[in-house]
Every structure is written in structure tokens, then in C-alpha cells.
């Protein structure tokens, strides 16, 4: 379990705690992978089990928020994504960082607290 330091985060949505597969945000608790913008949890249809199951529809959802930064938390360990994911994001002219999910939660919190337009998929 990783409890995230709450340094007076002023963002509408942020992580309070992360335990493998369980996310406690300031707005609720979730037991499935999340897609977030800087301001909300985004609803999606196709199930995400791992980095291999991220689909174009998930990336389209994130890209529609016009983020300056995209984070993808790949689970317990940092994993390399399928090339299709990198290509789709690159075609949109966005930067993306892949990291372990606990690190992605911390990074998301730091960026939203700086009022950065960040979106993420956290597995």
C-alpha cells in the first residue's frame, strides 16, 4: 500500500492512496484501471486488463481532453507499450511517459497541483 502525501492539493481530482489495482481518489474509490483528465475520471467502455489491452478508443478519450502531458501507469512495474500506442500519441503531437502505476499516481498529483493539463491511464 502506498499512501500519497497530500500537500494541500488544489486540483479537482487527485490520488490519495494506491494499492495494486485499487485507487483511492479525493472523489471516491475505484477497483479497476482508471482514465483521468486533470479535472475528472473519464468513463470508458472497453475493459483494460494490462498495457496490451489499451485500445485506440482509450487513447482517443485521453486525446480529446487535449492534454499537454499523458501518463500511462503500467502496473507494478514499468513496461514497454505496444508500438501502436506510441504511434497514435505521437501522431497527435503529444508526449507520453510510461511508468509503474505508483509512480504515475505521484507524478499525476504533482502535475495537477501545478495546474498542468495532464491525462492518464493507470492500470
Swiss-Prot record:
GO terms under cellular component: plasma membrane
Subcellular location: Cell membrane
Keyword Metal-binding: no
Primary location group: membrane
Record protein name field: 13 kDa major membrane protein
Alphabetical UniProt keywords: Cell membrane, Membrane
Upper taxonomic lineage: Bacteria, Pseudomonadati, Pseudomonadota, Gammaproteobacteria, Thiotrichales
Any Pfam family matching the protein: DUF498
